[in-house]
Amino acid sequence: MGIIAGIIKVIKSLIEQFTGK
């Protein structure tokens, strides 16, 4: 669960960077 949650967090961060750009 921890690994999956970490991956989701990273993906969300990348999406925010692209959309926030």
Curated annotation (Swiss-Prot):
Any Pfam family: PSMalpha
Secretion signal span: none
Keywords: Cytolysis, Formylation, Virulence
Entry's induction text: Up-regulated by agr.
One of the protein's GO biological processes: killing of cells of another organism
Lipid metabolism keyword on record: no
Post-translational modification N-formylmethionine, affected residues: 1
Miscellaneous comment as given in the Swiss-Prot or TrEMBL entry: Peptide production is higher in most prevalent community-associated MRSA strains than in hospital-associated MRSA strains.
Similarity annotation: Belongs to the phenol-soluble modulin alpha peptides family.
Protein task: Peptide which can recruit, activate and subsequently lyse human neutrophils, thus eliminating the main cellular defense against infection. Stimulates the secretion of the chemotactic factor interleukin-8 (IL-8). The ensuing activation process triggers an inflammatory response in the host, thus contributing greatly to virulence. Also possesses hemolytic activity, which may contribute to the development of disease.
Name the UniProt record assigns to this protein: Phenol-soluble modulin alpha 1 peptide
